[in-house]
From Swiss-Prot:
Listed PANTHER family: LIPOTEICHOIC ACID SYNTHASE, PHOSPHOGLYCEROL TRANSFERASE I
Bilayer disposition of the protein: Multi-pass membrane protein
Superkingdom of this protein's organism: Bacteria
Membrane topology, Cytoplasmic segments: 1-7, 65-68, 141-153
This enzyme's EC code(s): 2.7.8.-
UniProt keyword terms in alphabetical order: Cell membrane, Cell wall biogenesis/degradation, Manganese, Membrane, Metal-binding, Secreted, Transferase, Transmembrane, Transmembrane helix
Pathway info: Cell wall biogenesis; lipoteichoic acid biosynthesis
Protein name: Lipoteichoic acid synthase
Natural source organism: Staphylococcus epidermidis (strain ATCC 12228 / FDA PCI 1200)
Length: 646
């Protein structure tokens, strides 16, 4: 490389760094982030939003002199690039953006190494090529740099321009998306309108506000929530109320399961033949085909949290990680106090993942059968932990010896991203979509279906089937929007935002002893499971704070809110600010009569649930029907025998 005729000055290096980082951010918008950008205004906003914070941050280093200025600008640029790339990798895996809250979950990343590494792409060098070039110049081609001081009078101009551009950006954003900063349920909106860097600043401010909320919370805040949830309560259905009193409850978590798999064939073979039978209505199970997950960033942990507490997860981060030491009125604790149930969770991963070993104590869960209770030899492990077949087999053995009635929650793992399976376990050919994630998903889902069938057979052999409520559900979507092209090949139809919402159906199957099965087409979500189960065992939900409604109730609320503020009803869905018909997923030209009421209810639900978590409001609840859980009572010893409740 020959010496350039004109050296690179400090200000020129600053402009070059701002330009290349901004360019990389544009690249991420269109290649990696699914932001749903439409129209001239939104594209103009994308052009503006990265520049303001990049320029403002890096302009601070213009006050330094000589080599220091070059190096500080470089380091600042590298940190911004690292933040961008971290968001890219995180988005590929979670379809969401990094927050300060998710940093508290960083310990989970080590356990998910294979899944995270699968998120890397061949073109990722684009995000670092400028950084490498600048570093090479700073180390090996210092003669190219002009270290002479330049007039600092330009620096305040740059800063003022950056701030002015931010407010102009915000004005455009508020015009296109009113109340953007007050209705902040969806991070994609915030990044689309503010950019990833301003979003990080905004998230930091919100995190501080939420931390202050607990200190300022009072019993009056709880009263407001109680008054609201009591108005939402639905009466139990007399036909089902108490039908399963003191029966065992077995809750089976199907990792990443989506119901587009039901009755789906690949190369002429059913992907989920056993679940297909359970979905027919001719078995012991009632199938809810319009059951949706309601998780946020916490994914699996949000699913557990919502179904055991009838509360929403957090808008940022995982409630397990951030609110694990709160006071709760959980389903396992209520079952114990009202009907003497023992409770346990069974999972082929280690107990510290998702902070479970601490959270479960606050839920009043008696026993935790983690990976130390299972044979974790190499032949039994794939992806994140224990394969489903040996997991189910060992779990059934443990359950056959449990004190009854018990509440047992089994969490599977094999059908987890990146959906890899040992050759000897694969018994269905992969489709050929050209996407290893989608193709692998078919094989791992088929394996999960086989494992589930073997487990149900074991329950029958061990005499547990007839006297147990058995609940099966998918915890969250498995295939994100990043794989829409492959999904279109697999399903043979266009994946629009409305269709992707339909794909968030994760299924719910429920066997109640003494009741025949069927198909229940009510629209419901994970929030509704807790009141449904309480009524089945004969415990009235009226004395407990819950946001869901009994799925068997004749007054069941068919509005299903999502964590980002979208929602779906029997007739239409609200997605990314637009309303679509459920019949054909076409955009509605007229607003439904009940739309404003439903939208207000969804926003109020999310707001109230957030206040419960951020204010730790259950600590103020004096409920004569519930004694607060003492987490100090619980200890989860390592296997093989554990600490079983006698």
């Amino acid at each position: 490389m020959s010496l350039p005729k004109k050296k690179i000055g400090i200000f020129a290096f600053f402009l070059l760094t701002v330009f290349t980082i901004t360019l990389k951010t544009y690249f991420s918008y269109y290649v990696d982030f699914s932001l749903g950008v439409k129209g001239l205004v939104q594209n103009l906003i994308l052009i503006m939003n990265p520049y303001s914070l990049i320029a403002l941050v890096l302009s601070v280093f213009l006050f330094f002199k000589g080599k220091k200025a070059f190096w500080f600008i470089f380091i600042g640029g590298f940190l911004l690039t690292f933040l961008l790339y971290a968001n890219v990798v995180y988005f590929r895996f979670f379809s969401d953006f990094l927050t300060f809250s998710t940093l508290n979950q960083a310990g989970n990343v080590e356990s998910m190494g294979g899944a995270v590494s699968a998120s890397f792409k061949w073109y990722d060098f684009v995000y670092f090529i400028d950084t490498i070039i600048y570093l090479a110049i700073l180390i090996f081609k210092r003669k190219w740099l002009d270290n002479r001081a330049f007039s600092k009078k330009f620096v305040p101009v740059v800063m003022a321009t950056s701030v002015a551009l931010f407010f102009l950006n915000l004005a455009f954003a508020e015009t296109d998306r009113p109340e953007l900063l007050t209705r902040t349920f969806d991070h994609k909106y915030l990044v689309k309108y503010l950019g990833p860097y301003n979003f990080t600043v905004y998230d930091g401010v919100k995190t501080i506000e939420n931390n202050q909320q607990k200190a300022l919370a009072s019993e009056d805040d709880l009263t407001k929530v109680l008054n609201y949830t009591k108005q939402k309560r639905t009466e139990p259905n007399p036909e089902y109320y108490g039908a399963a009193k003191k029966k065992n409850i077995i809750k089976i978590h199907l990792e990443s399961f989506q119901t587009f798999l039901i009755n789906k064939k690949v190369n002429g073979k059913e992907v989920t033949p056993f679940l297909n039978k359970l979905s027919s209505g001719n078995q012991d199970f009632t199938y809810f085909p319009n059951f949706f997950h309601q998780t946020g960033q916490g994914k699996t942990s949000d699913s557990e949290f919502t179904m055991d507490n009838s509360l929403y997860g957090l808008p940022q981060g995982s409630a397990y990680s951030l609110k694990g030491d709160n006071t709760y009125q959980s389903l396992p604790a209520i079952l114990d106090q009202k009907q003497g149930y023992t409770s346990n969770v069974m999972h082929g991963d280690y107990k510290t993942f998702w902070n479970r070993d601490q959270v479960y104590k606050h839920f009043g869960i008696d026993n935790f059968y983690d990976a130390t209770y299972y044979d974790m030899s190499d032949d039994n492990i794939v992806n994140l932990g224990l394969k489903d077949k040996p997991f189910f087999k060992a779990s059934a053995d443990y359950q056959s010896k449990m004190k009854k009635p018990f509440y047992s929650h089994l969490i599977t793992l094999t059908n987890h991203y990146p959906f890899t399976l040992d050759e000897e376990d694969a018994s269905i050919d992969k489709p050929n979509t050209g996407d290893s994630t989608v193709d692998g998903y078919i094989q791992t889902a088929h394996y999960l279906d086989q494992a589930l069938e073997e487990y149900i057979t074991d329950l029958k052999k061990k005499g547990l089937y007839d006297n147990s409520v058995i609940m099966i559900y998918g915890d969250h979507y498995g295939i994100s929007e990043n794989h829409n092209n492959a999904m279109e090949k697999l399903l043979g139809e266009k994946i629009t935002p409305a269709k992707f919402t339909d794909l968030n159906r994760t299924g719910f199957w429920l066997k109640v002893p003494g009741k025949s099965g069927g198909v229940n087409k009510e629209y419901a979500g994970q929030m509704d499971v807790m009141p449904t189960l309480l009524h089945l065992v004969g415990i009235d939900s009226k004395n407990y704070l819950m946001f869901g409604s009994d799925m068997f109730s004749k007054q069941h609320n068919n509005v299903v809110p999502f964590r980002n503020g979208d929602f779906i009803t029997e007739d239409y869905k609200y997605v990314n600010g637009k309303i679509y018909s459920n019949k054909d997923n076409e955009l509605l030209t007229e607003k439904p009569k009940d739309f404003d009421k439903n939208k207000k209810q969804v926003e109020k639900d999310l707001e109230m649930s957030d206040s419960v978590l951020n204010g730790d409001l259950f600590r103020f609840y004096k409920n004569p029907d519930f004694k607060k859980v003492n987490p100090g009572k619980y200890e989860y010893k390592s296997g093989p025998k554990g600490n079983e409740k006698k």
